[in-house]
Amino acid sequence: MATNFFIQPITQEAEAYYPPSVITNKRKDLGVDVYCCSDLVLQPGLNIVRLHIKVACEHMGKKCGFKIMARSSMCTHERLLILANGIGLIDPGYVGELMLKIINLGDTPVQIWAKECLVQLVAQGDHVPDHINILKRNQIFPLFAPTPRGEGRFGSTGEAGIMRT
């Protein structure tokens, strides 16, 4: 059965880069590139970057988690950018906007242009996605229905792991 990503723009800016469509992953790429939806400048040190999208992943008909990983273009001889946590792990129950913590290791600000791809999404279990489904901005979609995990951001579950008594 299929592995699918569902991407929903949540701002007008994002709608321009994510028009409603279904994209078949003919090349069988493991990662799904994610656009920056506006020009931005990353100052030296820690930066928070809004991606203006919600994302859900489904494998074999069941919602699953996914990873946010840096693309090789994120760190080049012109710029030294890294994800603050190395790899972002998104819980299956998270239904909020995707955001990044990016560290600019350089001494000068770095310009990022709209439509530049710094990160990619990889399904839990490293399953190759069959389709990337781009939804309408205000479309009601079951995989984005409220969950106990909700829309809280970075480390917001407030619990240390899953082992509880």
From Swiss-Prot:
Molecular function terms from GO: dUTP diphosphatase activity; metal ion binding
Residues in coiled coil: none
Cofactor dependency: Mg(2+)
EC number(s) given by UniProt: 3.6.1.23
Record's catalysed reaction(s): dUTP + H2O = dUMP + diphosphate + H(+)
Gene Ontology cellular component list: host cell cytoplasm; virion component
Keyword terms: Early protein, Host cytoplasm, Hydrolase, Magnesium, Metal-binding, Nucleotide metabolism, Virion
UniProt-listed CDD domains: trimeric_dUTPase
One of the GO biological process terms: nucleotide metabolic process
Localization of this protein: Host cytoplasm; Virion
InterPro entries (UniProt xref): dUTPase-like, dUTPase-like_sf, dUTPase_trimeric
UniProt enzyme class: hydrolase
Keyword field contains Metal-binding: yes
Primary location: host cell
A Pfam family assignment: dUTPase
Superkingdom to which the source organism belongs: Viruses
Gene3D superfamilies hit by this protein: 2.70.40.10
Presence of the UniProt keyword Hydrolase in the record: yes
Swiss-Prot/TrEMBL induction comment: Expressed in the early phase of the viral replicative cycle.
The family this protein is said to belong to: Belongs to the dUTPase family.
Summary of the function given for this chain in its UniProt record: The viral dUTPase may play a role in lowering the dUTP concentration in natural infections to minimize misincorporation of deoxyuridine into the viral DNA and ensure the fidelity of genome replication.
Oligomeric and partner information: Homotrimer.
Name by which UniProt lists this protein: Deoxyuridine 5'-triphosphate nucleotidohydrolase
Species of origin: African swine fever virus (strain Badajoz 1971 Vero-adapted) (Ba71V)
